[in-house]
Amino acid sequence: MGEIRKYTCTCGYETDLRAGGGLAGCNIGMIANFFPKETEALVKERNEGRVKRYVMENEISYCNNCQEMMALPAFSYTRKDGYTCHFGSRCPLCAGELTQVEDEESPACPKCGKKMRYFVLGDWD
């Protein structure tokens, strides 16, 4: 189950994000909606007995072009040899690359760079 978080900064920037994952995070059909080519690779390797686990969750990321923080689907699977394949989303506003937030507890504000705080609004699934 994921969390609905409200991130706030003293500069006035705030955003509500759905972080983490829900029940659909292990549903191959749902993952394929977001990552069709990558899911084909997963299914092929899983059928060959090479996949240990897989999951899709919303990652909190920055778009440097838009100066926004967002939570978007990311998909990863770990093979039995220990190698992890990771696939993130692109910005839905500009199609640019995203940078994953390193510290979800107090990330830097995308507008001013100060540390942000969050509180949990609820859960989502």
Place the predicted regions along the sequence by residue:
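Short recognition patches in nucleic-acid-associated and regulatory proteins
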Residues: 13-60, 71-79, 84-100
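Short cysteine-rich clusters marking metal-coordination/redox-active sites
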Residues: 8-11, 63-66, 91-94, 109-112
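A broadly conserved detector of short glycine/acidic/proline-rich loop/turn motifs that flank catalytic sites
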Residues: 76, 104, 122
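His-enriched metal-coordination microenvironments in redox/metal-binding proteins
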Residues: 1-6, 123-125
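Short, compact, well-ordered microdomains
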Residues: 97-118
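Short Cys/His-rich micro-motifs in 6-15 aa windows
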Residues: 68-72, 112-122
